[in-house]
């Protein structure tokens, strides 16, 4: 799941038709499952020296953790050929929280607080290990 308490502004868009960007205000849940499909989809967006740490997919959307940022992918339209890629740089993270899976609750959660953006929350299915992602976020905080 992804949710944030603020609204992104659309710069340079036509007033009668705003682009369909990721809705960080939507409180709806979607569960992310580890999947390399989105790692391939964002390769052309990666900077020199930037590498994929892990990639996750929900029903249509995806999230990719790289060495420099989080890239959220919003698949749009009936055919899914149109996509919005939102870059969330680690350098803007002020705090984060990880909830690991338990004995009966197999899901885990990652809440990240971005300066001037608010909270972004990701929910993962199964026994997803957040160790590498957590370590990488911590490296950018300290």
Question: Model-predicted segments: where are they?
Answer:
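Canonical pleckstrin homology
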Residues: 99-127
């Amino acid at each position: 799941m992804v949710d944030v308490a603020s609204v992104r502004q659309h710069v340079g868009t036509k007033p009668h038709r705003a682009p369909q960007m990721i809705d960080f205000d939507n409180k709806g849940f979607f569960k992310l499952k580890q999947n390399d499909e989105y790692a391939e989809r964002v390769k052309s967006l990666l900077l020199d020296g930037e590498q994929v740490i892990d990639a996750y997919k929900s029903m249509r959307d995806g999230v990719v953790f790289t060495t420099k940022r989080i890239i959220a992918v919003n698949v749009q339209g009936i055919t899914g050929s149109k996509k919005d890629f939102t870059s969330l740089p680690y350098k803007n993270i002020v705090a984060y929280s990880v909830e690991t899976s338990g004995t009966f609750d197999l899901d885990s959660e990652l809440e990240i607080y971005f300066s001037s953006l608010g909270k972004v929350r990701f929910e993962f299915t199964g026994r997803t290990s957040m160790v590498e992602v957590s370590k990488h976020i911590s490296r950018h905080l300290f």
